[in-house]
A protein has these predicted regions:
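RNA-contacting regions in translation and RNA-metabolism proteins
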Residues: 1-132
């Protein structure tokens, strides 16, 4: 069973996007649907992790870049987000707790690349960086 079909069968919600890496699956759900998912099944992340055998990240989509960035990195305890628009390019700097920086960046920068890639699908994002 594919990840999208599995997600939709477990959550009973349509999925907006699914992105996979070696050890992680990122599910992006439609706006205002995350609450419904957790009301029906509070253990949805555990169920998906058990069936897929990879780390699971769920994020709620948004039409607003700031909100989408916060939703995508929510589990890492986002403190601040700075967005610079310059000459048609958008650069984002995210501040997280010092102990979470390694997890946000990921092994060989995989996680931060994945997050930037997902944001770039919805917004004209040039770079995404993490600071203390």
């Amino acid at each position: 069973m594919g990840y999208i079909a599995l997600f939709e069968s477990v959550t009973h919600e349509n999925l907006r996007e699914c992105v996979e890496t070696e050890d992680l699956v990122l599910f992006v759900v439609n706006e205002k649907k995350m609450g419904n998912i957790f009301k029906r099944n509070p253990n949805v992340v555990s169920v998906l992790k058990e069936r897929i055998n990879k780390h699971i990240i769920m994020a709620e989509a948004s039409r607003d870049l700031l909100t989408m960035t916060r939703n995508l990195l929510f589990r890492y305890g986002v403190r601040e987000i700075h967005i610079n628009w310059k000459e048609g390019q958008t650069d984002i700097q995210v501040s997280v707790a010092p102990e979470e920086i390694g997890r946000v960046i990921g092994k060989e920068g995989r996680n931060i690349k994945l997050f930037r890639e997902v944001l770039a699908r919805y917004f004209p994002v040039h770079s995404l960086s993490v600071k203390q």
